[in-house]
């Protein structure tokens, strides 16, 4: 614990805890403070002026990161026939119907994204208690219930990031790796923030995007001036 505390203190050196940094400067700091022996994920957190306990203040959506996420995404697809063939051709890791249902019911969930054709949603619905808590339940609002399984698989593999506001009004997501060029990280962050801004619910009142911070997996958080991230 003492060693970890020393590492964290060292990482925070040079950071002004109350300062709001421009996004370009914030990313430079995040990259310079990343000291783990693996390629850390760069993460964004956004505090929103919503109360997700109210249905008209729920924020949910998907963002296609222009430069990808840098992570390997394992994709499962519930489909039959030609659509199953499309999913396999697009690079889905596991494709099936009743057979895939049995695998998931057996507790074997070796995928990060789940896609389904509309006709198989009654089947997939049986897995609500398994997939729901893991954020894996297919949903038409984020493009994972679709007949275009080829496009959905390509998007998931290419860096599509789903987001959903948590109870405290916070959204967070991985938007790249510390090995990415600074400009690519900035572009990804701006794209993600723009997607969240466009997902503003009708019931949101007051300032919608209140605070933004970026960090790496093992690094300190860096507060960001929202106006340097938001395009509008």
Swiss-Prot record:
Keywords: Repressor, Ribonucleoprotein, Ribosomal protein, RNA-binding, rRNA-binding, Translation regulation, tRNA-binding. Belongs to the universal ribosomal protein uL1 family. Part of the 50S ribosomal subunit. GO terms for molecular function: rRNA binding; structural constituent of ribosome; tRNA binding. HAMAP family: Ribosomal_uL1_B. GO terms for cellular component: cytosolic large ribosomal subunit. Disulfide bonds: none annotated. The keyword Ribonucleoprotein applies. This is Large ribosomal subunit protein uL1. InterPro entries: Ribosom_uL1_bac-type, Ribosomal_uL1, Ribosomal_uL1-like, Ribosomal_uL1/biogenesis, Ribosomal_uL1_3-a/b-sand, Ribosomal_uL1_CS. Binds directly to 23S rRNA. The L1 stalk is quite mobile in the ribosome, and is involved in E site tRNA release. Protein L1 is also a translational repressor protein, it controls the translation of the L11 operon by binding to its mRNA. GO terms for biological process: regulation of translation; translation.
């Amino acid at each position: 614990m003492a060693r970890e505390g020393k590492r964290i203190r060292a990482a925070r050196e040079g950071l002004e805890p109350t300062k709001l940094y421009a996004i370009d400067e914030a990313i430079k700091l995040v990259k310079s403070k990343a000291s783990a022996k693996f390629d850390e994920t760069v993460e964004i957190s956004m505090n929103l002026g919503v109360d997700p306990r109210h249905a008209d203040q729920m924020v949910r959506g998907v963002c296609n990161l222009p430069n990808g996420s840098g992570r390997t995404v394992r994709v499962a697809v519930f489909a039959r026939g030609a659509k199953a063939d499309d999913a396999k051709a697009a690079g889905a890791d596991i494709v099936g119907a009743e057979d895939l249902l049995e695998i998931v019911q057996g507790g074997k969930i070796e995928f990060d994204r789940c896609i389904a054709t509309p006709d198989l949603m009654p089947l997939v619905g049986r897995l609500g208690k398994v997939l729901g808590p893991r954020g894996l339940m297919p949903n038409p609002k984020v493009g994972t219930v679709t007949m275009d399984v080829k496009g959905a698989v390509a998007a998931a593999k290419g860096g599509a990031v789903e987001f959903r506001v948590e109870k405290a009004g916070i959204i967070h997501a991985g938007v790249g790796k510390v090995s990415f060029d600074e400009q690519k990280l900035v572009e990804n962050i701006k794209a993600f923030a723009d997607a969240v801004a466009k997902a503003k619910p009708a019931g949101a009142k007051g300032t919608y995007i209140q605070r933004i911070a970026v960090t790496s997996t093992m690094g300190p958080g860096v507060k960001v001036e929202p106006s340097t991230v938001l395009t509008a």
